[in-house]
Curated annotation (Swiss-Prot):
Phosphoserine: modified positions: 254
Gene Ontology cellular-component annotations: cytoplasm; cytosol; nucleoplasm
Protein name in the entry: Transcription factor SOX-2
Gene Ontology biological-process annotations: endodermal cell fate specification; eye development; inner ear development; negative regulation of canonical Wnt signaling pathway; negative regulation of cell cycle G1/S phase transition; negative regulation of neuron differentiation; negative regulation of transcription by RNA polymerase II; neuron differentiation
Top-level taxon of the source organism: Eukaryota
Length: 320
């Protein structure tokens, strides 16, 4: 029986050494294995174990029966079948593996199995970093997509900033004043057209500008000056009544409002400490002199932007 096994197993032996184990791999794998052997002639293969001896013929049969089955699936099925075999069925293949090992030791007495641990660890790292490796091209595409999205977002932000400047929703009061001064002074637009195009935007600009200024003044002085913004919000209604002259006078008078508000801060500096303390007290303990200061500031800003004149007796900047 063993002689029959030897005669059956010996002819495929040279095929494996020459073909490089191309039992179910096909001509391409055999050619690649042959090329690898030519590239590394000093490389000596390990002797086959009992499972390899048994699975060599079984793999060929299964590959012929199922040509579309993948080699990994064939290996899984062969491993399951090998576990189901009894010891008596495995014995001839075990003895054949022992004989091949003894023959290998005679042919290569100095052979020592050196596992390629570096490649195995690299393979393990590749397995663990496989999602990263798969995501690496995707990551580049994501990075490029982020770059494109950042570029698009920058373009959108620029567009929104320009739209915000058109509507008066800018970040600083200086830019708001520049926008205010820039609209009626545009050479291609007359005052009437500017007033028709920008009445509501000018309303928003003045509200934002004076609200931003009064918030800082309220924190410093401790007196509520919200009436100032309300009185200034009434000026665009006057601008709607007389289109051209009021728009120019409002634009020219809006920068001096800042200076006048800074001048109007001087009388309140004597009671700054008291006003700051009263600002943090409850509503019932707020002293009554806050109302005159509120009335004073409201009267001051209501009397400011009169059409045709400017604040503090200065001439309007209509010639600009």
């Amino acid at each position: 029986m063993y002689n029959m096994m030897e005669t059956e197993l010996k002819p495929p032996g040279p095929q494996q050494t020459s073909g490089g184990g191309g039992g179910g791999g096909g001509n391409s794998t055999a050619a690649a294995a042959g090329g690898n052997q030519k590239n590394s002639p000093d490389r000596v293969k390990r002797p086959m174990n009992a499972f390899m001896v048994w699975s060599r013929g079984q793999r060929r049969k299964m590959a012929q029966e199922n040509p579309k089955m993948h080699n990994s699936e064939i290996s899984k099925r062969l491993g399951a079948e090998w576990k189901l075999l009894s010891e008596t069925e495995k014995r001839p293949f075990i003895d054949e593996a022992k004989r091949l090992r003894a023959l290998h030791m005679k042919e290569h007495p100095d052979y020592k199995y050196r596992p390629r641990r570096k490649t195995k660890t690299l393979m393990k790292k590749d397995k663990y970093t496989l999602p990263g490796g798969l995501l690496a091209p995707g990551g580049n595409s994501m990075a490029s997509g982020v770059g494109v999205g950042a570029g698009l977002g920058a373009g959108v932000n620029q567009r929104m900033d320009s739209y915000a400047h058109m509507n008066g929703w800018s970040n600083g009061s200086y830019s708001m004043m520049q926008d205010q001064l820039g609209y009626p002074q545009h050479p291609g637009l007359n005052a009437h057209g500017a007033a028709q195009m920008q009445p509501m935007h000018r309303y928003d600009v003045s509200a934002l500008q004076y609200n931003s200024m009064t918030s800082s003044q309220t924190y410093m002085n401790g007196s509520p000056t919200y009436s100032m913004s309300y009185s200034q919000q009434g000026t665009p209604g006057m601008a709607l009544g007389s289109m051209g002259s009021v728009v120019k006078s409002e634009a020219s008078s809006s920068p001096p409002v800042v200076t006048s508000s800074s001048h109007s801060r001087a009388p309140c500096q004597a009671g700054d400490l008291r006003d700051m303390i009263s600002m943090y007290l409850p509503g019932a303990e707020v002293p009554e002199p806050a109302a005159p200061s509120r009335l004073h500031m409201s009267q001051h800003y209501q009397s400011g932007p009169v059409p045709g004149t400017a604040i503090n007796g200065t001439l309007p900047l209509s010639h600009m």
